Design a protein with these regions (language model features):
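Glycine-rich phosphate/diphosphate-binding loop of Rossmann-like nucleotide-binding domains
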Residues: 44-67, 159-236
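Positively charged, low-complexity intrinsically disordered leader regions
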Residues: 1-52, 56
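Phosphate-coordination loops involved in phosphoryl transfer and adenosine-cofactor binding
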Residues: 33-39, 166-168, 268
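Phosphate/diphosphate ligand-binding glycine-rich loop within oxidoreductases
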Residues: 32-41, 47-159, 278
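C-terminal helix-to-coil terminal segments
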Residues: 289-320
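Hydrophobic/aromatic ligand-binding patch that stacks against planar heteroaromatic rings
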Residues: 57, 99, 130, 191, ...
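Rossmann-like adenosine-cofactor binding region
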Residues: 212-287, 292-293
Length: 320
């Protein structure tokens, strides 16, 4: 595997899951694979789980790691071509990216949607430039449209906790005071569509996602109806995708908060969220603190998903 930006890059998903479970049994069995290899992790946006889990995964494989926060201590980067650079951005991404590639073997990039230009966001303007100009394997640590490391961890978690071969998985929109990207819900829907699970997406009207990610999922505007018989509830806020409201908060309807009354409609479902979570906006205290909440095991699996991806990339390098 050269690059990792979506579920399709993994190839055989069942095989990738098996690799993940083997790694989870012994995280250090491939500790020589990354010897004398350096991972550069580039953050345009804040991170807790992604930063820690990916760095730990690289260390498990014997890699050296360098972490660069673009907005703290590095030069501000210009991303547009044709711009007269007489402002506060002294370096262009087109020089910075190949320079970064000189100092590492693998690059991880975290760059959220900016909500300034929908086309730029959905063409992955930042991530794609690293793939094009770095001459290194590149993987997404969350980009404008997808968060594949999170979705892989979500899938690992569901496989561990499911009680039936084809569980009903419901992704529900929930309120949030700020405008959030569609990357996590897009990615989660895409990965769930790659399984044979029953997948339902529920949200208020106006929060429809890009159809290419929704795929074969059933869309239900009645949240309580969607919850009926669910085995997993995956809560997440996202801003509007459809024009002319792209990137905007068009509702903060608190009736969409996941609470115990709604969870009682499910098949004793497990509650999932990628974290960080706004308590009593996204989910009530009693639900996230309940025995059915698996947000911590879900977060722990971020290390496993990252290590599986890095292992596959390193094996690709060793075959060159």
């Amino acid at each position: 595997m050269r690059h990792f930006t979506c579920v399709q890059d993994l190839g055989d998903l069942k095989q990738a899951l098996n690799e993940a479970f083997e790694i989870k049994k012994d995280r250090f069995q491939f500790s020589e694979l990354g010897k004398n290899k350096t991972l550069l992790m580039i953050f345009f946006n804040s991170s807790l789980r992604t930063r820690l889990s990916t760095q730990k995964a690289a260390m498990n494989l014997g890699m050296n790691t360098i972490v660069l926060d673009v907005n703290q201590g590095a030069w501000k980067l210009e991303t547009e071509r044709g711009v007269i650079m007489d402002g506060d951005k002294p370096e262009h991404l087109l020089e910075a990216v190949p320079v970064m590639g000189c100092y590492c073997d693998v690059i991880g990039v975290r760059s959220f949607a900016r909500f300034e230009n929908k086309e730029d966001d959905y063409n992955e303007k930042i991530l794609s430039q690293f793939i094009e100009h770095s001459d290194r394997p590149v993987f997404s640590m969350e980009a404008a449209t997808r968060h594949p490391l999170q979705s892989f961890a979500d899938l690992i978690t569901i496989e561990e906790y499911k009680k039936t071969a084809r569980p009903k998985v419901v992704m529900t929109w929930a309120p949030h005071p700020k405008s959030l990207p569609q990357a996590v819900p897009n990615s989660f829907a895409e990965w769930m569509n790659a399984t044979d699970y029953e997948i339902v997406i529920t949200h208020p009207e106006g929060y429809e996602l890009d159809p290419r990610f929704v795929g074969n999922a059933k869309v239900e505007y009645d949240q309580k109806k969607a919850f009926e018989g669910a085995d997993f509830i995956y809560a997440k806020n996202w801003s509007a995708y459809k024009d002319p409201n792209y990137g905007q908060v068009i509702s903060t309807d608190r009736s969409w908060t996941v609470d115990a009354e709604k969870m009682a409609l499910t098949n004793n479902a497990y509650f999932m969220h990628c974290l960080p979570v706004r308590r009593n906006m996204i989910v009530s205290d009693d639900v996230i603190e309940s025995p059915q909440s698996i947000v911590i095991p879900e977060a722990a699996n971020r290390e496993i998903s990252a290590q599986t991806v890095l292992k596959k990339i390193l094996m690709g390098l060793s075959n060159l």
